[in-house]
UniProtKB/Swiss-Prot annotation:
Keywords: Magnesium, Metal-binding, Methyltransferase, Plant defense, S-adenosyl-L-methionine, Transferase. Mg(2+) binds at residues 268, 270. Methyltransferase involved in the biosynthesis of methyl anthranilate in response to stresses. Utilizes anthranilic acid as substrate, but not salicylic acid. Produces exclusively the O-methyl ester. The lineage of its organism: Eukaryota, Viridiplantae, Streptophyta, Embryophyta, Tracheophyta. This is Anthranilate O-methyltransferase 1. It comes from Zea mays (Maize). Pfam families: Methyltransf_7. S-adenosyl-L-homocysteine binds at residues 20, 61, 66, 102-103, 146-147.
Length: 382
């Protein structure tokens, strides 16, 4: 069955050992790294706009615990801000409306169960005057749909947030269909032709520009966006950290072709709908559109192995790290890979991938480059 983004682009569902719920620690670590940026943007909304009902949207929310961590963090920031700045009573706190958005294939059933647990946990604090006085009323809804389309009314949202989503494209470049390529070129490689690389770059430019235009329409004047996604440290597109990550996946798929487990034609027609941009590429699009003021942009790094918290260049156990990296990538890629090659190859594929990652880490400890962008809707004078 051919891959379809709107159907197949979602994280591995459920709560099993290969699920996204159990393998989303990298995203959790990224959320911790960008907390100060999120706090600054949230406080700016509270200070400048003073909304009675604050509408917050998490775009590409997925279905794991990080989604509710975001809700908890924003609620905490607002409660703390109101206490410090205004010493507000509970009846004067803003009401919070959270919209959790993702494509229809997302595991919304699991997400709604987490929301129910979250609401029950919040309810247990009722009656505790000290705690309740600091808790803004909070309402949470799911919102299926692509963030590459309009999903909110005009000027209705105060704060947009997105974590590890905007590296995903709305589609693989259309012009690549039917193009002759190497089995290893599922993403950008050093041997890929410049014309093919340009197609990946143009798809990013098209998608990111569209995303910003859509959010501009949906944000209130002075509204904020905090966007965190996989990028690259250097401007040279051939030296991106993601190139290694997905290159090893391509090699693993090629090994299954050699074993007769995967059809060569299926691998030759497979592209990842991904692009990891540089800071320069992101800034250029924001400035070119002129729709947003840029408050903050930075790059930080996270080890491939989410359980490796060391800052050095050595990997202490490459085999274990290889397995950890494979679990994380499987949780993200499983539905896409299964739609193209079938579910029966998944265990063998990611076993091979873990082996290749371990070998790679013996020679080079590699890290994800993560971009954090904080922007504010600009006032355009006609």
């Amino acid at each position: 069955m051919p891959m379809r983004i709107e159907r197949d682009l979602h994280m591995a569902i459920g709560n099993g050992e290969t699920s996204y719920t159990k393998n989303s620690r990298i995203q959790e670590k990224a959320m911790f790294q960008m907390k100060s940026v999120l706090e600054e943007a949230t406080r700016a909304v509270c200070t400048t706009l003073l909304p009675q009902t604050m509408v917050v949207a998490d775009l590409g929310c997925s279905s794991g615990p990080n989604t509710l961590r975001f809700v908890t963090e924003v609620t905490r920031i607002i409660a703390h801000h109101c206490k410090l700045e205004h010493n507000r009573r509970h009846d004067h706190l803003p009401q919070l409306q959270f919209f959790l958005n993702d494509l229809p294939g997302n595991d919304f059933n699991n997400l709604f169960q987490l929301i129910e647990q979250f609401n029950k946990s919040s309810t247990t604090h009722k009656g505790d005057a000290a705690t309740e006085a600091l808790q803004p009323p909070c309402y949470i809804s799911g919102l299926p749909g692509s963030y590459y389309t309009r999903i909110f009314p005009s000027e209705s949202v105060h704060l947009f947030h997105s974590l590890f989503c905007l590296q995903w494209r709305s589609q693989a470049p259309e012009q690549l269909k039917g193009t002759q390529k190497s089995c290893l070129d599922i993403y950008i490689t050093k041997t890929m032709s410049p014309s093919m690389v340009k197609l990946f770059q143009q798809q990013f430019q098209k998608d990111f520009s569209l995303f910003l235009r859509l959010r501009y329409e949906e944000l209130v004047s002075g509204g904020q966006m905090v966007l965190t996604f996989i990028g690259r440290k250097h401007e040279d597109v051939f030296t991106g950290e993601s190139n290694h990550l997905y290159g090893l996946l391509a090699q693993s798929l090629k090994s299954l072709v050699d074993e007769g487990l995967v059809e060569k034609e299926k691998l030759e027609s497979f592209y990842l709908p991904i692009y990891s941009p540089s800071v320069g590429e992101v800034e250029a699009i924001v400035k070119q559109l002129g729709l947003f003021n840029m408050n903050h942009v930075k790059v930080f790094e996270i080890n491939w192995d989410p359980y490796d918290d060391s800052e050095g260049d050595d990997v202490h156990n490459s085999i274990e790290s290889g397995e950890n990296v494979a679990k994380c990538l499987r949780a993200v890629m499983e539905p896409l890979v299964a739609s193209q090659f079938g579910e029966r190859i998944l265990d063998e594929l990611f076993k091979e991938y873990a082996r290749r990652v371990a070998k790679h880490l013996e020679n080079e400890k590699t890290k994800h480059a993560v971009l954090v962008l904080s922007i504010e809707k600009a006032i355009i004078h006609v």
